[in-house]
Amino acid sequence: YSAMEEDDCFYGFGEKAGLLNKNKAFLRERATDAMGYDAEKMDTLYKHIPFYIRLRRATRKAVGVYYNNFYESVFNMGCEKSNYWPRYTYWQADGGDIDLFLLAGGSIRRVVDNYTLLTGRPALLPKRALGYQGSSMYYPELEKDSDDAVLDFIDTIKEEGFPIDGFHL
């Protein structure tokens, strides 16, 4: 449990639908194949990362919180109210250790820099990986001719002169 201010901003948590600021959100961390998901309201998608940045709006100061635990878990980012306690957040996991890292920095940029120092930074990708990589849940859900729809889309992109390096379904 952690105390929070009413207007604190919370960013991160991996791939999540909805608003970028997760203040007053309840988030589940688990890897799920979310076919046909709701882009505004659905929670669990493919990439769950138990890391968030809290930005204190009044001071514009940021801190990162990383739980090195990949069991299924939940984050409550102030969506509960108590008659006995001020506003709070909490994290709860189904197992494992509490391996908690608090990442100082003051600004979001510095917190992200410290997070990547801790978790590692990616190597420079090959040029082909930096181009357009298309993906959509739209095509597999078509009632018929989904393969033709994908090929038509790729042909249209090529006709427009837009480079495409891959398309994933």
Per-range role (PLM):
Residues P163-L169:
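Aromatic- and carboxylate-enriched substrate-binding clefts and catalytic-loop regions
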Residues Y1-A129, Q133-P140, S146-D148, I154-E159:
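Catalytic and substrate-binding clefts that recognize carbohydrates or anionic sugar/phosphate headgroups
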